[in-house]
Amino acid sequence: MTPVTEPPPTLRERFRGTLLGVAVGDALGTPLEFELPGSFVPITDMIGGGRFHLQPGQWTDDTSLALCLAESLIERNGFDPVDQLTRYCQGGRLGGRQPRR
């Protein structure tokens, strides 16, 4: 029997996976941001807290800015600095692009 192979991911799926990785890594690392290596117990779950007192799974402005950039690149079909800056400013006024529960 020949093994079934999955088709390679599309470019869209790869972009989506990248942004998901950014958000998950940001949410996992936020509680330890600015901490010195070895000064904390390693985490194995979404714990929240940290200097920003975020809820478990909540990301920071790093992810919000990455989402603004991705939206701008997609909707403008390339780099548009005015659109990108506008999105950054609107995101700040609207409380950023925080996860919805």
Feature locations, PLM:
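Structured, active/binding-site neighborhoods that engage oxygen-rich ligands
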Residues: 1-101
